[in-house]
Amino acid sequence: MTQWDGRGAFYDCNKLTSITIPDSVTSIGVGVFSGCSGLTNVTIPNSVTSIDFEAFYNCSGLTNITIPNSVTSIGDSAFKGCSGLTSIMVPYSVTSIGYGAFEGCTWLDKIYYQGAAEDWNKIDIENTYNDKLTSATRYYYSAEKPTASGNYWRYNENGEIEEW
């Protein structure tokens, strides 16, 4: 199996709270977790290269999401309505973020990006209905304590995101 295609697979599974997507999956398909409001924890493997249209639509229980280094594309409305989402980790590999990908993410206020500011500016971001994505505070990755002013983050000794 290379793609999880929504079409009813996990649609509106409100009791689903946690899921680890198998390594065999390369694409999280259209609406696969749409309406899973109880979903609080998602582990996405490095085999996934795209998160498609409405993949996590209205997953209001998600508070943060780490997108793996393999993902290049975040589709239209992929995380639309994830009203509990407060932070996301966007890898350097992402080259496009679709229309309304983070629409309705009312509490999204922190974006941890694995690259520098100039790299972020190269991402093809469809700005329509992505206001929270573009207005959230962005933190750029730095393994060493930065000397320049700005917002930076690193991985701590436990592999967790930590702001400098």
Predicted features along the sequence, with ranges:
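Structural signature of tandem-repeat unit edges
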Residues: M1-Q3, C13-S27, S37-S50, S60-S73, ...
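A structural signal for leucine-rich repeat
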Residues: I123-T128
